[in-house]
Structures are given as C-alpha cells and as structure tokens.
Amino acid sequence: METKNALFKKIVKISDQLLNKISIKKLTKDKKNNLFVYFDEFVDVTIIDELHQLSKTTLMHDLQIWYINNLKEVDHKKILTFFKKISEQNANLIFLEQINDLNTKIEYNSNLNSLILKINDKLIYDHFIANKLEILNILKVWSLPYSNFEIHFENLSSLLNEKHEQAVNEIISHHIQQQKHLEQQISQQQNFYNNQKANFNYYKNPSNKTITKLIDINPLMNNAKIRAYVFLKKIDILKSGAIAYKLNVIDDSETLTIMTYLPSGEHPLKKFLDELKIDQLIEAEIDIVLDNMSKSGQVPIGKIKKICCVEDKHVKKQITPRLELNFHTKMSSLDAIISTQELIDFAVKNQLKTIGITDRNVVQAYPEIAKFSKKQDLKIIYGLETEELEDQIPLVLNVRDQNLDNATYVIFDIETTGLFPNFDEIIEFGAVIMQNNKQIGEKIQFFIKPIQQINENVTNLTNISQEMVNNAIDEKTALLKIKEIFDDHILVAHNGINFDINFINQRLLKWGLEPLKNPSIDTLMISRAINPFKSHRLGAICKKYEVDYNDESAHRADYDAIVLADVFKVMKNNLFNDFGITNLSEINTKLQTTMLKNRSFGNWINLYIKNQANVKDMYELVSISHTDMYYTRPTITTSFLANKKDKLIISNSIHESDLINALYSKNDEEIKRLIQRYDFITLPSLGSQKHLVYAKKITIENVQKAFKKLIYLALELNKIIIYSSSPYYFFKDDKKFYDVYVNTKGLEGKAHRFANEVYVPDLEYIDQKNAIDELAYLEDEKLINLIINENPVHINSWFDDSIQPLKEGLYAPKMEGVDQKTIDYVYHTAKKIYGENLPTIVEQRIKKELNSIIKHGFSVVYWISHLLVEKSMQDGYGVGSRGSVGSSLVATFLNITDVNPLTPHYLCPNCKKCEFITNADDGFDLAPKSCEQCQTPMLTDGHNIPFETFLGFDGDKVPDIDLNFSGVYQAVAHNFIKSIFGETHSYRAGTIGTMAQTSAENTVKKYFENRFNENKIIRDSTVSLYVQKCIDSKRTTGQHPGGIIIVPKEYSIWDFSPYNFPANDINETWKTTHFAFEYLHDSLLKFDILGHDNPTILKLLKDYTGIDERDVPMYDPLVMKSFSDISALNIKPSDVLNETTGAISIPEFGTRFVRGMLVDTKPKSFADLIRISGLSHGESVWLGNAQSLIKSGKLLKDVIACRDDIMTYLIRQNVEPKTAFLIMEDVRKGKKIKPEHQIILKELKVPEWYIESANKIKYMFPKAHATAYVMHAWKFAWYKIYYPLEYYAAFFSVRADNFDLFVINQGKEFIEKTYNDIEQRSKSRDPQKKVSSRELALQPIYEIVIELLARGFKISNISIEQSQATSYVIDKENNAIIPPFIAIQGLGETVANSIIEARNQKVFSTIEDLKNRTKISRTDLKNLRVLGVLDHLSETEQLTLF
C-alpha cells in the first residue's frame, strides 16, 4: 500500500531530502479543494516555511494545502520560533519577536487544545490581547491549530535571577521599537541614537549600497536601500504610548509603505520624522516584510533601519508660465483632481500671475479660491463652463404648413466613410418613398465611389468594402441623383438633423451645389421627445414598436431606410393619438417636452465675470441653470444667455462645442456665424481631440487643418483667439489618476463622458514652451506668439483685478421694532422670575448681553428664535437648545434655551429672595432648602457659563442659535421661517458632499479590480496615492440638517450666492445656497432648526404620564445614582450583560463608549455629568488625555472638560480675562497655546500637566451644549426610574421600525445569545462572519430590551386588536408594552395606518378579511403568521361541513 509520504510527493514537487524530514500521518481533502496534511511528529518552522514555498508548485489545480502539526507531545516553547517567523512577515505583529522565556511562560491544555501564555510585559500583553484572533488564525496557517489562547498578565520576576531580571528590563525598555531583530541590535542602535545631535539625520552619509527601484521590491528580498519622495505621512499613538510612523513613498517606478515604531518620550529619530515634510526626497535602508493587512497577503512593506533626507523638496519639472483661463477644480463633480489649494500653490510656485477657473456647471470653488489667493500676488478670473440649450430644440427642419396624412415622405439613410463631412464622403444611399402609410415603388439603393479608400473600420461598421464601390457613381453625380429622389417631399431620417441632412448639405456645398430645402423630420429627436425609453437607437425603438430588426443587416442604408419606414408609421400614429399633431408645423412647438430637453445635447460654453457688478449676473445664471432650466443637468437657454451678453464674457468650450464640431462638420459661413457669437475664441490643444484620433474618427492632420481654419477665420473676423489646454490635472503623469473618474460611474449610475472612448483626451496644463512647440503646425512664429502670449495679455485686461465672489460684513435682516421687543420681553421674563428688583448679577448680565446684541444687529436672530420656540411649545412640542446659546442669559429669558448661565443660586419662587453660591459647581447640585424669609421651598439653577463663549469676547461674533425641534415638527418650524421672511429670502444652508476617505478607497480599489485581473498585486501605498488625488472631489450637493439662511429684504440671494436644489432634486420644496454655508457664515444669518428624537420622546412621555418635562425635578439622588449604578433600577449587572450603569438608552450617555466613561469617572453630581458630556463630545480630550489624568489620580473636576472651563479656570488663576478667552479659543480649535501665553500661565503657576493637556486637544465642546444635553438626559433617567413602562413605550415608539420581533419574542436568554453572537462576529476578521449594518443597529436595542425584561416588564406580541400603527401601547394589567405594526420589518407606516383605519371601521373577522381591507402585502402576512399574530383568526368565512 502506498505510504502517505509517497502520495504527498505525487501532489507536490518535493525533494526526497525534504520528504525524509517529515512523517505524514493522514491526508484528507474536502469539497472546497482544501488538502489537510497531518504530521506524526512535530515539524519545526523552517520545514513548514519550505513546505509553504513548495505548496505553490502543487500539481493539482487550485488545491489549497493546510499543514497540521502534532500538538500532543511537544514542548510548546517551540512556538517561539513560529512567533519570530510571523513577526518577520506581518508588520503589525512585529511585537511577537520580543516574546521569550524571560517574559512569557507557555503551557498547553490538551483537553481544550488551548495555549496558556503568562506574560509579565504589559505592552506585549496588550498587543497580544488586541491581536489574539489574528494570531490564532495565522498560527493555523503555520500548522498550529490551537483552539484558543488563555492570556494572563503575571509578574514573573521572582522566578528569575538577577541576571535575567536585568535582561528583562532591557527588553522592556526597547521592545516597542518593533523593527529590531535581535537584542544585541537593539543595544547597538540605542547607543547610536544617544550619540546623535538634536538635528538628527538618521545616517548622514548614505551607504554605497545600490539603490533598488520600488517596483523591484518583493517579499523574497530581505532588505534593500531605496530613494523616493514622501507623499503621505501618518502618525499613530498606540495605547501603550508608542508611536507608529508610516510613510508612503514614491519613485518613478512604484510606491511603497515604510514604517517604524518609536517609544514615547524623547528619541533622536522622532524629531527627524516629525519634521519630515511631504515631497521631501529620502534615502532609507529597510527590512522587507509582508503586509498581512493587505488583501493578498503578498504585498511588501519596509521596516526602516536607517533613513536620511536627500532633498528638501520634490523638484518637479520646470514649467514656463502661460496664462490659462480654464482650470478645473475638484468642484467639477468627479471630473478633476486639482484642489483649490493646489491650484493656488501651483500658480504661485510657477509664477502664473493670472489664472481662470471654469468648473463644469458650478462655481462652488469660488469661495476657496478667493480665500487661498487673498494674500498672493495672483489675479483670479472667475468663470464657468456650462451647457447652452436652444430655446426651441428642432425636431423638424425647414418647417412648412403640411398635413401629415397626405404628405409624401422619403425615408432614407446614408452610409459614410466617417462622421465628419468636411473630411469624409458618402458611400451608400438607401431610401423608400411613402404616401398614405404605403410604400410607393421599389426601395432605392446605390453605392457611391469615394475619393479616399474605404478602410477596415468603415467596412466593419457598414459591411461595405472598397470592392463594392469601385464601379459606383461618383459623389457629385450621386448627390444630384439624391436631390432628384427627394424632389419636394418631406425627408425622414434617424438622427437626420445632426448627421444625415447636414452631411448631405455639406457635401452638396463641397461640390458647389445648393443645399436641401426640404422639410426634414428627425425620428431620433421625436423619439427622445415622446418615448420613455432609455435608448433611442433605431434597433431599440424597433424592439419597443415591435418592428422586425436584424442586427446583422443593420447599418446598411437600404435596410435601415426600410425599417425606419415601419417605425415612422407607428410614430406618426402616436403623434396624432397622444399629442393631437396633424400638421408638420406642430411638431416643433408641441414636442418641446421635458424628456426631449433631458436627452438633447447642447453647446458647451465658457462664461467669465468681467467686473464686481457682474458677479450677481453669474450667480443668477447658475441659479436658473440649476432650477428652472435643470434637465437632468444644469442648462441655460440661448435667449437667457443673450440677456447676459453685455454682462458676462463668453467663449467656446473645447469639448461638446458647436464651434469645434462645426470645424469638422460645417461650412465656412456657418463657422463664421458661430465665431461671431463669442467675445473671444478658445483654440483647444491637439491633445484634447485625441479621443477622436485614436477612435479613427479623424486624423491628427485633419484636426490641425480644422484648427488652422478656426484661427484664420477668427482673424478675418477680428476675433481674438487664445490657446487653452483646459486642464483637469497639472501634469501628463497625473492622467492615470483622472482615469479613475473616467472609469467610475457617477451619481445615479451616469457614466463619465469619456467612459466609452478608446483613448481619454489629454487634459493636463500645457506650459508656454510646450504650447509653442505644439502650434508649430502653423509655421508662423508671429501668429503662434499672438495666440500664446499677446492675445491672453489683451484679454486679461478685460477683467477687473480685484473681483470678490463673497460679500464682506454681516447683512442681517431687519424687523421693525425688534430691538425694543427683545428688551421688553427679556425684562418682563427676568422680573417675573427674579422679581421687580433684579439682583445686581442678573441686571448687569442682561445689560452686557443686550448692549452687544443690539449694537451688532443680532436682535432679529434672538427674536425669531423666540417666536419659533414659542410656536412649537404652543403646538405641544418642547424644544432643546444646542451649541453655545445657553451661554446667553437673554436667550434664557426669551425662552430659547432652558439653560441658565448665571452663577449657581437659590431662588424663592414666592418672595423672590435670591442667593448666589459662588463656590458651587452647578445650581442643580445645591441641596434642597426652604426660604429663610417665607419658608417656601427654594428653586435652584445656574450653570456658571460665560457669555463670551457665545458671541465672543467683544460680543460681535455672528450668533449660531441651534434648536432641537421634534423630528415630526421640524418641517412646520422651517415653513414658519419661510412665512416670516418669504420664499425668495429663505434658503436651506447648502452643503457639498465630497468623496470621503473610505469612499475614495472603495472607488480606487474597484478601479484596480476592473482594470487588472485578480492576480495583479496592487500595493496599498499605490491605492493611497490614488486616493489622495480623488479625496475631497465633489460628488453631490446637500443641505444642512436644519440650517435656514435669511437674505435681507433689500438684497437678493444673488448678491451672496447662487442657489440650487439639494442633490439637484427638482422635487424638493426648498432651494439651498450653492455655496457651502461655512463661506456665508459671516455675511448672512442662519437659523439652525434641527430635528431630534428627544423632543418627540418627551412629548410622548407627557402624553403617557401627564407630567410635563418642565416639572421633572432636577435634584434627585436616585436619578444621580442611576448614571453610574444599575442598582438604582433594582437590578444587578449580571441581569443585563454585566452592565454596571443604569445609563442604557439615556441620550448622550447610553453609548458603550460613554458608559465606559461613567465607569471610569463615577460621577457624583450634575456638574460631573456636564463634564462627562463635554469630554465625550470633544476630540483628543478624553482618550490619551483626561482619562489618563484621572487614572493617575486627578479628579474629574480638575481636568479640562468643556471649552468654558478653560476661561473660567484661568480667570480664577488671575489670568487677564481677554487673554483667558484667547487661550480658550486657541485650545478649542485644536491650536496649541501660544508660546507667549504659556509664559504667562507658567508665571501664574498654572500646572504643567494642565498646559500639556490643553495642547493635546483638537476640539472642545461648549459647556452650554453639554448642559442642555445633560438636562435632557436627566429627564429621561427620571422617567426611566419612576415611569418605566411609559419610558420604554415612548423610547421604542420613536424607533419602532428598528426592531426584530422574531428575536425579541423568544425571550431574554435568546436575545442575550443573539447579542453575544453579534458581539463576537463583529470582532472577527473572518468574512464569513461579517455582521450586517442592521444587526449592528439592533444590538443597542437588544441591550435595552434585556434591561426592560430584567426589571420585570414584558414586550407583548403584536396584537391585531390592540396594536397601534407607530406607537407602543401600555398594558398596565400585564406589566407590558404592545408593539406597533411597523415593528414588523418591512411593514411601513402606510400599511400600518391602513390596518388601523380598517379596524376602526370593523374588527377583522378572518385573515382573508384582513387581507382584503388593508394594504398588507404577502410578505407582511407571512411575517404575521410566523409571529403567531393571526393564530386566533380563521382563513376565511367558509364553513366546513364534514
């Protein structure tokens, strides 16, 4: 019998020498072509490595080999060698090479097949925990199929002698430099580091080792020396404090990722890497390892051993500047790779003194271009490339009064040698003559002999060869014959207007013959106007009209003419039946349909702003093109354009241009007519026409002839002509990035305009020298100089030098008497609360705020916000404030916010005695007490928030009043604003949706997948290079969730911005600003009317309980306890997934992240909750900052939590208020404290740790916002404790459609099992265990349900008799809540309402009755059956007799 070893040799090309080193116990193969090789004895890592290499030479196709070591009788310390090997080939597991018998004890549990690791090194322990599953999976690949790891952190030092302890300490101090291979190397390199100077250049004299091109770096190499430019630098701070540096570098062949890890603290290489800039040229010696995070696992990356800087800047090729008027930026939707900042930098660096921008259809780059060019010696010419549509799109030429029924038609087609009659010829004519829907005579067909030879492309398309036309008549004779056939009849052709009729006319003129004057019907245009088809090719129309069409016979003139005759019969009938068209003269007027305009191709033009006054005209034009004249894309009519003739400069575009197309297809007189339309002529680069050349539609020589004609005709007409390459990217090499756009479908699945071209035109910036070289075909240096240099200078003088696209200063709307109304209302409310004699603190604060508000014209914002809140409250919906508005006491007294920013205080509601407690953290933490004067229980309030955080230190910052309305009420609030200011003065704040990092990565990866086969390995560094070019490219427009922009009545929106529909959806009721609101923030006021679930839930709670949220007590020890202790709910952690807090489902505190913060901080007061809210919403405020400080012993009240804390704390430290404010502003914006301010702080003994903490912060939350959030959270917690059923019913009612009754109906144990399964799979990297987005969304719902059940309540099943459409029903009798119908997945609100309406009329008697009287679907019915909801109903009313 054949041995297993011998059998294995038949499968793999293995040498006898290697085969003798292994003993195979078993070979098994599964259905998925996996071969499992089981060894008798333990096989070490070097042999496994050799076997892995041999596995690639398997003799069996697609066989995957898995080696399985014998784990039973082996010293498991041997796996250390496997750890070393894994660390060499997996960069993010490099810490494994630090594991040794000094820091790790290894044991094996054979019963569980589990490896037990006892680690005394915290960093290794942390890394192992974080990467446990990945290591387990990789070990299986390396023949070690452990089922699990048990990992323990233990102090092993007592087991070691002094020498070993010293070795351990040395490893601990160095192991996070994970790129070192041996302990000796670590020691040597550490000594080397210490000897370097502060301006460390990792090795000053690069070694003589040969430079390896990046494309040649491969996994089989151990190390290499590279020279490359840095194009991406990423720095990550690990939990351990170590720093991971990743550099993506590029040379002229490829890209590569190189990386290193450094310990926290000072390190010579750290300074070098921190200061390393993008575009610097570096040399590095690297060890080459595999990037195990890559998809293939075969991508090499480099571990930096040595590195130095060779050049400070990436020196790109020098260019000679040329004025270019048609730069395109990333605001041309998915169509350019030039960012606005890059454009300005490019212009400045290359000494372009003037640049023009003409993004396609939009002017959204204007604000950034103006911003970035402001301090540069650079003139901007603001332009636009857009599409012009004729006011009446012709479907019939040479219209006459002719009844369609009694007319005679010649239905014809021609075949030609190409598309362009100026360079191509007719080679076949076919026709049929039709009258009264019947063919007259025989079909007509004849060939025409061209002067030029018929090439292979033409033969392939038309099935006409040169041999077939050799004996045919010449073209002039043929044209005379065609005219005779046409007589005075009506002509019918498919695409006749743009091709057949024009082609014949141009060839007639070529031969000195009169052009056609016959009425001509274009069936392609009619189909576009009347047929809702996607394709209007003749074959596609035949299929829809049920006309026979043979693709093999198509594209021959006679066949196409016969088929078209049948199509025209159907079409003519439809014109009468659907449009009442009986006369030829009616077609053009009655068929100007939206479908026609959606499908017609217009003329692309470039428009430019001459002076400041014309900015408004451009904005009007852009607005109209995006709204009134939007036909699947922005367009503008010829007549509208004519009205702007004296206000905007107009030139032709280089693509899809009537003028450029006319050079190929029209006669000189027509070309002259078109030239006269333009203020100047744009001569395209030859490269811009290469798509036509490569498709063999025209030769480059003929393009040159056409361009010469354009130049000489323009000169003849005294029109200035200038050269343009219309750049979409800077350099020729950048075209590969542009190719991503060309091969990526845009929004709504629309293909890029060049997607079907065999060659994408060249659209880089062509500098002066190369432009001159290109125009050498003119053979006239003076003329070339005129076009390249002199004319652009002349045109430049037409434009003002200082056009500003944005207005400066605030333009607030005016309302008569609004200042006095505000003053009166504020004092009325203040005195109502605090008494006629206002406390000094209150009086001073009101005066201070009102002075600023009225002085800067902000009263109207406050007053309208007050009216909005008042209306919402009257309609039964509370409003929550966001942002810093709670910093304003005036806002409090106008009822805009519930937050009181005063110093914490007691207030007697009876006698108005007010007592301010200056040393208290928060008014809601003041212990209850009675008034000393009248014994009435005193109220408490005041959160100690400075006004400066809202309107700035001088009170002149434009106010952002953000209000949270109920989601169901938001639209009402929006329309309330519109009713006050009017539709033409109220706009939604616009947003611009750009390609984000993840989207760009997916797009680029898909591009590579489509371009290359799956065996082609694309490095992640290459993907990142492409991503960098694509990221931030505009995809679409949108609208701020609630921002409403107000334009003063004395102005037009066009004084500030164009407008459009969000995402160009013409069905939207609101228009948005074309510019993103961030650029209008300082000139126009915005009301943030946001939709939120919280006000909706609180409204439901009021309906359920009868208790208004305003009556919820804000001091309650049990509520306070619930934030950190689940026992406040009378349950234990073990009852709810080991949760220790009672904060599940509490807004802003219910997420797993914030619940973890609650555990860490153990809040004891309302002030603590505000701090936690601030910490959780900031960036780099908690993690790696406050969290560490608290763990080191600092109290929660000591750390920086909210931005206001900085100002108030520093003022207490005797910092001058303005300086404290400025420091706060720097810190909250992510800027470090200025050196001069740090000196002041240190002089005033502000702790160093405080300064360091502030300097880590990237963004800070305002205290007023945090306070508003906490107030809502507190109310939720109160209802949750005292009205639990009502609370859960309200909470789930707002989220009723995000529910899985199939899981929930099976009880607590099953829900917990489902939750844990999602949890485990979410941590797995196995694609088979991928968690769906719905499962992730349901996980927090399961938490809440488990808590509800643990508290002794129930969720009943859906009830046909009791369930409501969208809200939960409270069943007190059964201590339960009953879900609504929309809790069933897929059952929408419309269906749910139909069930309620039918039930209100009559109870459902049977399932059939339910089905007949509601809109319920088959799937809904099935789900109801599975849930057992219909068990008590019979199927039908029929009786069973037996």
UniProtKB/Swiss-Prot annotation:
GO terms for cellular component: cytoplasm. Signal peptide: none annotated. Its EC number is 2.7.7.7. GO terms for molecular function: 3'-5' exonuclease activity; DNA binding; DNA-directed DNA polymerase activity. It is an enzyme of class 2 (transferase). It catalyses: DNA(n) + a 2'-deoxyribonucleoside 5'-triphosphate = DNA(n+1) + diphosphate. The keyword Flavoprotein does not apply. It is found in: Cytoplasm. GO terms for biological process: DNA-templated DNA replication. Pfam families: DNA_pol3_alpha, DNA_pol3_finger, HHH_6, PHP, RNase_T. Keywords: Cytoplasm, DNA replication, DNA-directed DNA polymerase, Exonuclease, Hydrolase, Nuclease, Nucleotidyltransferase, Transferase. Residues 409-568 form the Exonuclease domain. Its main location: cytoplasm. Required for replicative DNA synthesis. This DNA polymerase also exhibits 3' to 5' exonuclease activity. Belongs to the DNA polymerase type-C family. PolC subfamily. PANTHER family: DNA POLYMERASE III POLC-TYPE, DNA POLYMERASE III SUBUNIT ALPHA. This is DNA polymerase III PolC-type. It comes from Ureaplasma parvum serovar 3 (strain ATCC 700970). The lineage of its organism: Bacteria, Bacillati, Mycoplasmatota, Mycoplasmoidales, Mycoplasmoidaceae.
